[in-house]
Amino acid sequence: MRFFVFTCLLAVALAKNGIEQRSASEEIVSFYQEKYKQDSNAAIYPTNQETPSVSSSEESVEVQTEKDEQIEEENVYLKQLKRIKQIFQKFYIPQYPEVYQQQIVMNPWKHVKTTTYPVPIPETTRIPLEEIVKKIVEMIKFNQLHQFVIPQYVQALQQRIAMNPWHHVTPFRSFPVLNF
């Protein structure tokens, strides 16, 4: 009982400590993020005091141009990815190094002569998903038809005790038993 109470108190204390550390670390992170934003704004953009006020329509135009630029960059990036994908689809790159079949020929002078012949790698063929599904269905039907059924007569047989010829039980005793 004491151990249970102790573990509960310890868990509560650790949870409070973790929450306090998280809140402190979150405050530090937010402070540095604000400081970074202020530094980056000061370095790149002048502060609001230095620039005259800009109307809301001009700000919305700037925001839209920035969004358009981001969309264009994303489109260019996607086009480049598509080109790279098309280039790699043209080339067949094997996943494993080529296997060479070695033939060993014994010379009469007890020297081993080895020759290597490249094993032809067949081109990969793509099988449609429908054919794969058909094959799976056929295999399931085949397995259902040819299931091995245990015959019922095997279960009905009684177990017999194996007899040992050295411990043969005789119906008659070799010595008389006296009952008083």
Swiss-Prot record:
What is any one of the record's Gene Ontology cellular component terms?
Answer: extracellular space
| Keyword line | Milk protein, Phosphoprotein, Secreted, Signal
Expressed, tissue-wise, as follows: Mammary gland specific. Secreted in milk.
A GO MF annotation of the entry reads: zymogen binding
Where does it live in the cell? Secreted
Q: Where is this region: Disordered?
A: 46-66
Protein task: Important role in the capacity of milk to transport calcium phosphate.
Protein name per UniProt: Alpha-S2-casein-like A
- Source species: Oryctolagus cuniculus
Question: Per UniProt, what is the name of the gene that codes for the protein in this document?
Answer: CSN1S2A
